[in-house]
Structure formats: C-alpha cells, structure tokens
C-alpha cells in the first residue's frame, strides 16, 4: 500500500517516522528546512512510545505530480491550511484513494469533500502530544498515540482495516470505528473547550482555575459542545461532562493549547486555527439554533490575543 504523509509537523512526522521504520511504502510531502534536514540527516524521532531513531521514507517531495496516485493519505496540516493542502494533494488522489485527516476540529471530512476529486474521505483522530523540536526532529512526549478512523456513514472500506493493521505493526495503536462521529466530537470537546477557556480568560489552566465559580464556567463551555453535537444527532456519554471537569482539574497549571500559544506568539488570526476550532463552533451553534455564549466570547477575544504569555501555576 502506497501511503503519503501530507504535512510533516508533529503529527505527520510521528506517524511517518513509525511507518518508515516498519518498512512501509511511505512517502513524505514536505517543504522548506524540514525537507532539507530530512534529506541530509533523515527524520529523527524521539518518542516515549517508539524510542529514539532516524529513518528515511521511500520518497519525498513538494510537488504532488511527482508522487503519482496514492492508496492512502494521512493529512496532518494545520486547519488554516486545509484549502491549500487539498489543492496541492489533488494530483495524488484517485477514485479509490482513502484520505484520513488528523486535524484539530470536528468531522473535517465535511470541509474536504468539496475540495478534492472523487475519493473516500474518512475522519480520524489521534491521541498524542508531539512537536517539531527543530527541522527534521520530531519529539513525542505524551499520549497513547492511538489513531481512530472511520467513514462518517459507518460504511468502512476494507482499506481502512488494512491501514489500521499497518499502523499497529509500526507500533501505533489503531482502530477502525463504526461511530467516528462520536469519537471526533469527543476529541473536539476536549481540545476545543480547552482552547475556548484559555482564550476566554487569557491564560493557561492555572489561571482559569483561579477564577470565581470556574467549574461552573467550564461546565457551561463543554455543555455547549455537547448540545450542538446532540443537535446533529451525536449523543455523548452521560459521564462525559464530569470526566472533562475532572481532567481539567488535573491539568498542569501552565497547560495551554497550540491555538492559544500561536495567538499569544503574535500570529495573525488567519494564520492560526481560530476559525477551525472556535469559529466553526459558533457557526454550527447558529445553524442548529443552539446558543454558544462561551465560544462566542472566546472567539471574539481570540483576535485580541497578541501579547506573549508567561507560565502560571
């Protein structure tokens, strides 16, 4: 199976490195200094799960036409780069290609369908914390690394099961689910609500927890996600809210999301995932007739967050 990793950031490099080490027929779509470093020294992976090693893919490049059609593509770009990514990826997509997006956001397949040639677009999630320490060097620090994927309509293609098997043999836990909609919403409820809270209070988890009645506010924020999901026919487990509150209580005080960090580092709103993570929830709330005041306020504040932030406990 010819597999392409499109987007060699923290997620793409983690998966790509594992597959390359396992001898999979894997290719990297990579540009700039990252590509230069990998061509010269190989991809350096430092992982709590996989260990420390260097690998080279079967091939890499930055021109989609040079790869030919792929059997499977993992899309691991930033949400704000989705439109350009689909455009650049199109030459590698055939009628039988399966595309698995591993982006922040919920049910990204809905956004991709109008942008790609006819193919099979799944949805996917991954539980991992990884980042590029420097060009050509990915560091994975936490999370199980588990990939969950599936077609939104529950009609999963055999190639998804083959892909899951390849991932597992490479050391990455993987599962094909008949209910990817719930898994996608659950991950979004965690990541999206965290991002909303950090933007809303302009600070990390420790600052949020020091607010008066903070647990009430946190509960209201995650309830907005649960209610919008319910309007789309996705029912969360009854224990989800309490589990989320317990998890938020346990976060290290300096915990932030990549969206909040990007905003505080001074990146322009359009160069971050503000629209994918916060703006889309506001839009879905309006479409469903569900009030989402916490997310609306967080979205408004996100465009104002430009000052560097410090660590708080």
Task: Give, region by region, the residue ranges found by the protein language model.
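NAD(P)-dependent Rossmann-like dehydrogenase/reductase catalytic/cofactor-binding core
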Residues: 219-313
């Amino acid at each position: 199976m010819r597999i392409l990793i499109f987007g060699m950031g923290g997620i793409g490099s983690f998966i790509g490195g594992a597959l390359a080490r396992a001898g999979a027929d894997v290719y990297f779509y990579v540009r700039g200094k990252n590509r230069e470093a990998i061509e010269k020294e190989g991809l350096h992976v430092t992982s709590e799960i996989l260990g420390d090693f260097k690998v080279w893919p079967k091939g890499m490049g930055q021109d989609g036409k040079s790869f030919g059609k792929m059997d499977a593509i993992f899309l691991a770009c930033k949400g704000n780069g989705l439109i350009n990514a689909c455009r650049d990826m199109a030459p590698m997509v055939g009628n039988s290609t399966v595309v698995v997006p591993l982006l922040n956001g919920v049910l990204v397949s809905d956004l991709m369908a109008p942008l790609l040639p006819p193919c099979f677009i799944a949805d996917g999630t991954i539980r991992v914390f990884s980042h590029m320490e420097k060009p050509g060097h990915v560091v994975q620090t936490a999370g199980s690394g588990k990939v969950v994927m599936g077609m939104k309509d529950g009609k999963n293609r055999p190639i998804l099961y083959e892909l899951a098997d390849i991932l597992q043999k490479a050391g990455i836990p993987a599962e094909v689910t008949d209910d990817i909609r719930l898994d996608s919403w659950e991950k979004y409820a965690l990541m999206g609500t965290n991002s909303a809270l950090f933007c809303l209070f302009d600070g990390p988890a420790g600052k949020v927890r020091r607010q008066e009645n903070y647990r009430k506010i946190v509960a209201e924020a995650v309830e907005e996600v649960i209610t919008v999901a319910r309007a789309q026919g996705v029912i969360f487990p009854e224990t989800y809210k309490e589990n989320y509150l317990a998890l938020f209580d346990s976060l290290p005080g300096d915990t932030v999301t990549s969206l909040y960090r990007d905003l505080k580092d001074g990146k322009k709103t359009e160069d971050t995932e503000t629209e994918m993570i916060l703006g889309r929830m506001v839009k879905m709330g309006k479409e469903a007739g569900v009030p989402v005041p916490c997310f609306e306020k967080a979205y408004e504040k996100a465009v104002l967050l430009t000052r560097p932030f410090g660590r708080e406990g």
